[in-house]
């Protein structure tokens, strides 16, 4: 069974995750992390958990300054995504990437609404509606970022470009080379916008949001969708495939869209609850609770090896893996224990993230713990601290519960392995140190 899976399924999965599209999404979405993390720092400061501090920030006029940074970083996440994905795709094709990113950005702006209606019914035109440059435009940004670059690269590969004489600066040459593909792409975007606007009184990005993004977000936010996501990552890891890359490449756009939708509810002054449209499954749901201490939540495994292991091999591995695990890095354990391709650890490794998913989903669904806004904590931030920074002491306590559960889930399996290793070590003949003298 295992051999057939490795021969038939693994090559297909590897081929999928190595496609230019998936690689572009993975690399492109990472570009949004820096501004989102910086924005999250300002968001934490602006909504400091001590009321006296918030009062001082408001009275001194500092809070609006902090909020300005939050709005600027969170509100352009879709724009960053479309540029990042397009840039990454063109780079993989060995074509000039910056022009590709700019053309994709222009395409995205053409396809999105350029007006808003005020509460009084007045239509204000000629604006960039930040509703669509953040979470609601995320899937549209991904789609544009996957469609524009292949067209752009096709023109350049076929040498359909304006050629400049030798000696012209490279930047000027690249700009003129992009003119023909840019004209074709932006004209096509204008035609699509005209059809949507004149024929259906809407825009391309709005159609994508209603037809594609909303159903996908609902599916992702369901318990079944969450369990499937949490199962897939460690399942692939078990067979040596980087499951986090696969899940991240497919799910990051949707998870970030859910996070930004939650933040929009907070910014509107409404309480962030499920009843008010809040989402349970967000980027933080996955990063800070399902992938805590690494894929498979292996901290329980490492804690046993560090404190209780009797065999020399596991003791040494525990010492090697404890510090990296605290910062979310568990490759030493995955390949050292090993967890990968080890049938004795398959059940806890694949099952623990699913258990954590069920615990967290229940805590958020029932309101025991608060839903998450757009605050992004680096995945390398140690547990408990990351939970507190994310949503206060309740989230920190939830992380602690998951860490404790991890220990008991792994315990019977690693004890058995430890006992087997100990017997094997005792049965190994001791080499005579003076043998070679």
Mark where each language-model region is.
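Transmembrane alpha-helical segments and their short flanking loops
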Residues: 2-16, 55-63, 121-122, 263, ...
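Early transmembrane hairpin of solute transport permeases
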Residues: 14, 18-162, 340, 360
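Membrane-interface segments at loop-to-transmembrane junctions
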Residues: 21-22, 26, 165-177, 212-216, ...
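Alpha-helical transmembrane segments in multi-pass membrane proteins
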Residues: 78, 82, 86, 103, ...
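Central hydrophobic cores of alpha-helical transmembrane segments
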Residues: 99-108, 240, 248-253, 349-355, ...
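Generic multipass alpha-helical transmembrane bundles of integral membrane proteins
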Residues: 184-308
């Amino acid at each position: 069974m295992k051999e057939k899976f490795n021969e038939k399924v693994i090559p297909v999965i590897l081929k999928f995750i190595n496609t230019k599209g998936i690689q572009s999404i993975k690399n492109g979405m990472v570009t949004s992390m820096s501004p989102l993390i910086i924005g999250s720092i300002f968001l934490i400061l602006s909504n400091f958990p001590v009321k006296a501090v918030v009062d001082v920030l408001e009275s001194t006029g500092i809070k609006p300054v902090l909020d300005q940074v939050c709005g600027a970083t969170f509100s352009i996440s879709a724009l960053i995504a479309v540029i990042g994905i397009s840039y990454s795709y063109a780079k993989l094709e060995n074509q000039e990437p910056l022009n590709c990113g700019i053309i994709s950005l222009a395409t995205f702006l053409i396809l999105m609404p350029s007006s808003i209606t005020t509460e009084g019914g007045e239509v204000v035109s000629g604006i960039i509606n930040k509703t669509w440059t953040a979470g609601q435009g995320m899937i549209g940004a991904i789609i544009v970022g996957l469609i524009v670059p292949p067209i752009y690269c096709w023109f350049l590969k076929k040498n359909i470009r304006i050629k400049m004489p030798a000696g012209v600066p490279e930047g000027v040459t690249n700009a003129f080379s992009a003119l023909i593909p840019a004209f074709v792409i932006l004209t096509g975007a204008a035609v699509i916008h005209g059809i949507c606007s004149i024929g259906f009184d809407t825009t391309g990005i709005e159609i994508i949001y209603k037809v594609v993004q909303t159903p996908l977000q609902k599916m992702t936010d369901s318990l079944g969708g969450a369990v499937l996501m949490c199962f897939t990552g460690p399942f692939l890891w078990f067979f040596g495939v980087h499951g986090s890359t696969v899940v991240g490449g497919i799910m990051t756009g949707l998870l970030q869209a859910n996070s930004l939708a939650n933040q929009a509810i907070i910014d509107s002054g409404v309480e962030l609850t499920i009843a008010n449209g809040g989402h349970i499954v967000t980027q933080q749901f996955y990063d800070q609770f399902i992938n805590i201490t690494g894929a498979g939540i292996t901290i329980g495994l490492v804690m046993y090896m560090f404190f209780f292991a009797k065999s020399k091999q596991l003791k040494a591995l525990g010492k090697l893996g404890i510090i990296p695990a605290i910062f979310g890095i568990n490759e030493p354990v995955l390949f050292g224990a090993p967890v990968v391709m080890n049938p004795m650890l398959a059940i806890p490794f694949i099952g623990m993230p699913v258990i954590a998913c069920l615990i967290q989903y229940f805590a958020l669904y029932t309101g025991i713990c608060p839903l998450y806004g757009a605050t992004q904590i680096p995945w390398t931030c140690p547990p408990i601290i990351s939970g507190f920074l994310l949503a206060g002491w309740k989230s920190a306590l939830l992380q602690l519960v998951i860490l404790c559960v991890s220990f008991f889930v792994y315990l019977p399996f690693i004890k058995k392995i430890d006992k087997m290793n100990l017997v094997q070590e005792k049965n190994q003949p001791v080499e005579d140190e003076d043998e070679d003298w």
